[in-house]
Amino acid sequence: MKIGSRVKHPRLGEGIIIDFCKYGGVLIDYSDDKGVLVRVSHRDTIEVIHE
C-alpha cells in the first residue's frame, strides 16, 4: 500500500489512499459523482485493488 493506491472497503466502496495516520489508520478519498467523502479507515478493513 502506498499513497495513490486504489483500495476497496466492504461498506464504503472504492477509494484512493491520500495519507497514512497513526495507529494503523489510512485516510481514503471515497468521492464520486454523487458527492465528496473522505474518511479514515483501519488498514485491516481495506483491500488493495491496484497499487
Question: PLM ranges: what are they?
Answer:
Residues 2-51:
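Basic/aromatic-rich interaction segments and small domains that mediate binding to polyanionic partners
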